[in-house]
């Protein structure tokens, strides 16, 4: 077992015997409302005889349901007689009674199951109309079946986290069960314990209950919060991170418990590899803490590459292939735009969950990468090798925008509706209450009175609108409702029970009123009875004398629900629309947007997307957009996978990343006619998903990074992809914002205190601002570094190279008067050459009769004084720095794996032009995890060197180095903790 307890990991001695590792991994999706875990276990690979297990079960179920249904349900457009004849003929051919036909699909006899399908297709009768109806229904069933994700065939196991209910989802509500070695309970057990504790609690014990139960620990992520917890008379202070870490530990324990108790076989070994998802717009402080906190649980390999929106996209992409690459790939290609041997489409993921909204816009490109077969090689049955490359065009979202925000708005509406009803009933004499009468007579705001009496509906109208927060009376209405029905428990723990009872009613109202309205457009309603209202008032000391209990009820309808939910839903869909339009808008503003790139596939995820008002709002916004072709077939929402999709998608993505293989090795499979698919998951991290801007004195922000910028591996010893800004001036306060799309919200991402640095360097302000330069660096996790330097940076040279002195004329120095006298080049089209130009790929360009297809590396005659860099050496015995040039990125290496450099000369006697070979530099023998650019340096000693990535800076770990010119000091951006808007936090105690 893993050392899940928080305090044990640091005290443990290394074991003498190496731990036995579980050969797979698990993916954790810790949600605001619910959590799931998916396990990858390679212990056995099932062989499908008909279809993968999940698809076969769905096909059996759907056919059984269909053939057992009456004609009016099975095929509404055909006559009952035709349907009965159809069933009778199938039953006769299968030698079974029509009433027992469904048994064929429930038995394990596969031959009989296949024969039943054959008989369905043979028994279509003579009526063309009937045949069309049956064929259409069969197509719908098959289409649904082929879209069932084949989890088992991919060795992916949704972990049953709630053993008693056999449920793979568990509510994220948590109860602290142990303070020493902090432990939690989660799910319905925690929820039931909370209800029981509140019902039995006294005023004193309620404080303990508030400290012990946490409805949704995820909402604390990234916050520097402390929680005083009282348990069994002991009190301790715990941090938000400890609470979340304990929740992960509990999910891992539940996964281990399932492995021990499940009837299936599992591989042995300790869980030491994990994939952990996080919200798409989580700041880098969250991403960094995820990895650290899970590692502290004894998990030594933690992957945090996949945010929630990207994970959902990978899941539904996998579902799109239907578990059959031969059919799935061809089906996928028909929905793409083809250009040569590439097929592409744009996918927008909109995941509105319980607490957060996550978005990702991804370009999927399928490319035929089938290896070349030599003439003597057998091509066999001609399978194809495809590579699918997802490119992240942009991501966005909101950390406090989801289903719980909608429930909170229904909570407020319901609370005010109850208060309005009770005050009206007192005014009309339908009930008597001294407390409410005193409230009307002495405390009620005048806007709610008419001739000294409560004005019916005056409270409700303040909230029964789309954006009630903008109404000046909004707060007054809520404050008045609080006097009737107190639920604000932050300062009064005794109100906790009323809050949770009303919250449960609001959640029930959301689920009922959020359904699709009846066909006759009659209103859906949700009603609280007199008994339910009385239960709510038990804690408020409001005593009622009711004349007619049947007349006491409060009703909301679906129109009121939609008005309350509208602003949150429009906000989420507005973010999606803004992201889509900003990324797909043509660069040329004169170009017609209707002819621009479009979103080809919209994936909806998260249970909030099941609300009818969400789907109607999506139609309203997307159907008229020039960036989306409205087609219901290309809008995917599958309720049963709305939560599992995140952990399953992340688990599958990690499988693809770890089990990649070379196309050449697939030839034996291709000969058998089997298509192969590689999904280049890592490509998701090669481009920036959003903009970053720097605050200036005016309202205009300075863009430092643009969405879509390509990331590269800057140093061979690093395992991240990065991009840097140019060197720029520093400010006393350097503030960085994230902006997902133009005109989108600005999120404070981090800051760097230049004034503090200035004081440490003992510089005057004018000197500091003039001398100190800053360069920002960002990686694929959106984590910033701040590079600082006085003046221009110096570079560190620590690799060998080739000497140009042997080919450069003795009478002509390499550098003179601050200029380069010789040119160096590689392939590419260029202007007229000068003596001394140096090139690469000269021989390659001559081979293909393209003598101009070289690439100029260093050019003669340029004013090099501004381009010369200062070099410091770690080898060659050099004790003094020198000067030199750094090239732009070189073109790709030829197949030889080396660039050959030539110098251009004109023979003084014959006036003939020629290239003289300097020598070759091989591609550095380093393995890079991400795309890498290569550069060469040329110093004043005539040494030409090849570098992988950026030429490294001359650096120091001490800030004191900034007192001398050229030394680079690396600092970190001061990250911002998550700021929580209490108006959007249902469980902060102020509602």
What are these regions (language model features)?
Residues 298-311, 618-649:
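Conserved phosphate-binding/catalytic loops in two-lobed NTP-binding clefts
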Residues 3, 7-12, 17, 21, ...:
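Phosphate/ATP-binding catalytic cores across multiple sugar-kinase/actin-like superfamilies
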Residues 28-34, 340-358, 362-366, 402-403, ...:
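A short acidic Gly-Thr/Ser loop motif
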Residues 19, 32, 48-52, 87, ...:
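Acidic, glycine/GT-rich loop-and beta-edge segments that sit at the periphery of enzyme/chaperone cores
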Residues 271-289, 594-618:
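Glycine-rich phosphate-binding loops at beta-strand->alpha-helix junctions
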């Amino acid at each position: 077992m893993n050392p899940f307890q928080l305090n044990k990991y640091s005290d443990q001695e290394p074991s003498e015997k190496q731990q036995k590792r579980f050969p797979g991994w698990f993916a954790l999706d810790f949600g605001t409302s619910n959590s799931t875990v998916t396990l990858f276990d390679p212990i056995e690979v099932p062989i499908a005889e008909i279809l993968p297990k999940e698809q076969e079960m769905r096909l059996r179920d759907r056919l059984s349901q269909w053939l057992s249904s009456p004609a009016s349900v099975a095929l509404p457009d055909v006559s009952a007689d035709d349907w009965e004849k159809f069933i009778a003929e199938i039953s006769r051919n299968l030698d079974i009674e029509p009433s027992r036909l469904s048994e064929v699909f429930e038995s394990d006899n596969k031959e009989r199951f296949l024969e039943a399908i054959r008989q369905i297709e043979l028994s279509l009768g003579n009526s063309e109309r009937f045949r069309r109806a049956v064929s259409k229904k069969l197509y719908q069933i098959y289409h649904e079946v082929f879209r069932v994700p084949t989890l088992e065939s991919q060795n992916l196991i949704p972990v049953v986290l709630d053993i008693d209910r056999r449920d793979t989802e568990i509510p994220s509500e948590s109860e602290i069960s142990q303070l020493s070695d902090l432990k939690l309970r989660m799910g319905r057990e925690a929820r039931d314990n909370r209800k029981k504790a509140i019902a039995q609690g006294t005023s004193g014990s309620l404080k303990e209950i508030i400290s012990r139960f946490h409805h949704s620990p995820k909402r604390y992520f990234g916050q520097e919060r402390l929680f005083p917890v009282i348990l069994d008379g002991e009190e301790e202070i715990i941090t938000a991170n400890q609470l979340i870490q304990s929740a992960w530990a509990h999910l891992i324990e539940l996964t281990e418990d399932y492995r021990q108790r499940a009837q299936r076989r599992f591989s042995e070994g300790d869980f030491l590899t994990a994939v952990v998802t996080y919200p798409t717009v989580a700041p880098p402080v969250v991403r960094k803490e995820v990895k650290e906190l899970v590692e502290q649980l004894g998990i030594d390999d933690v992957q945090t590459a996949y945010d929630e929106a990207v994970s959902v996209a990978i899941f539904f992409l996998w579902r799109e292939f239907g578990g059959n690459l031969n059919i799935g790939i061809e089906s996928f290609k028909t929905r793409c735009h083809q250009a040569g041997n590439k097929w592409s489409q744009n996918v927008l993921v909109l995941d509105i969950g319980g607490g957060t909204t996550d978005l990702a816009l991804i370009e999927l490109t399928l490319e035929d990468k089938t290896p070349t077969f030599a003439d003597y090689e057998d091509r066999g049955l001609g399978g194809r090798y495809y590579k699918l490359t997802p490119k992240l065009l942009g991501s966005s979202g909101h950390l406090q925008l989801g289903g719980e925000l909608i429930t909170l708005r229904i909570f407020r509406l319901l609370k005010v509706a109850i208060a309005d009803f009770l005050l009206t009933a007192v005014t009309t004499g339908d009930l008597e209450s001294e407390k409410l009468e005193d409230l009307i007579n002495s405390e009620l705001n005048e806007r709610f009175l008419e001739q000294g009496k409560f004005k019916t509906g005056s409270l409700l109208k303040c909230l029964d609108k789309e954006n009630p927060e903008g109404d000046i009376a909004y707060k007054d209405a809520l404050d008045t409702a609080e006097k009737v029905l107190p639920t604000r428990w932050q300062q009064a723990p005794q109100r906790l029970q009323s809050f949770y009872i009303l919250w449960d009613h609001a959640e029930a109202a959301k689920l009922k009123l959020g359904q699709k309205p009846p066909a006759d457009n009659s209103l859906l309603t949700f009603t609280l009875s007199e008994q339910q209202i009385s239960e709510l008032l038990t804690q408020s000391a409001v005593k009622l004398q009711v004349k007619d209990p049947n007349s006491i009820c409060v009703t909301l309808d679906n129109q009121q629900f939609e008005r309350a939910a509208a602003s949150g839903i429009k906000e989420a869909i507005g973010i999606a629309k803004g992201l889509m339009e900003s990324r797909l808008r043509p660069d040329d503003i004169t170009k017609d947007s209707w002819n621009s790139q479009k979103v080809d596939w919209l994936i909806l995820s998260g249970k909030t997307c099941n609300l009818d008002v969400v789907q109607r709002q999506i139609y309203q916004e997307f159907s008229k957009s020039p960036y989306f072709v409205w087609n219901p077939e290309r809008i995917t929402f599958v309720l049963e996978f709305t939560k599992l999709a995140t952990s399953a998608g992340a688990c599958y993505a990690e499988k693809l990343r770890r089990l990649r293989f070379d196309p050449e090795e697939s030839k034996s499979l291709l000969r058998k006619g089997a298509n192969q698919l590689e999904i280049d998951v890592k490509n998701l991290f090669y481009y920036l998903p959003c903009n970053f801007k720097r605050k200036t004195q005016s309202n205009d922000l300075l863009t430092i990074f643009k969405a879509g910028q390509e990331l590269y591996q800057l140093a061979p010893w690093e395992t991240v992809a990065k991009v840097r800004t140019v060197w720029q001036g520093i400010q006393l306060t350097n503030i960085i914002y994230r902006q997902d799309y133009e005109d989108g919200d600005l999120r404070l991402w981090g800051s760097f205190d230049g004034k503090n640095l200035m004081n440490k360097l003992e510089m005057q302000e004018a000197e500091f601002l003039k001398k100190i330069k800053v360069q920002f660096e960002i990686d694929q996790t959106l984590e910033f570094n701040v590079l600082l330097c006085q003046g221009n940076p110096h570079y560190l040279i620590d690799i060998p190279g080739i000497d140009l002195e042997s080919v450069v004329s003795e009478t002509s120095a390499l550098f003179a008067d601050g200029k380069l006298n010789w040119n160096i080049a590689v392939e590419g089209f260029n202007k007229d050459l000068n003596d001394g130009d140096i090139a690469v790929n000269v021989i390659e360009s001559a081979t293909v009769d393209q003598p101009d297809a070289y690439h100029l590396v260093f050019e003669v005659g340029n004013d090099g004084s501004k381009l010369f860099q200062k070099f410091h050496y770690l080898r060659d015995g050099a004790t003094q720095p020198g000067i030199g040039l750094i090239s732009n990125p070189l073109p790709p290496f030829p197949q030889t794996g080396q660039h050959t450099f030539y110098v251009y000369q004109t023979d003084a006697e014959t006036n003939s032009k020629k290239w003289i070979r300097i020598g070759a530099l091989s591609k550095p023998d380093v393995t890079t995890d991400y795309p890498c650019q290569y550069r060469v340096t040329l110093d004043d000693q005539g040494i030409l060197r090849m570098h992988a990535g950026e030429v490294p800076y001359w650096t120091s770990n001490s800030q004191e180095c900034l007192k001398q010119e050229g030394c680079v000091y690396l600092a970190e951006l001061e990250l911002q903790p998550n700021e929580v808007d209490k108006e959007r936090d249902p469980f902060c105690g102020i509602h």
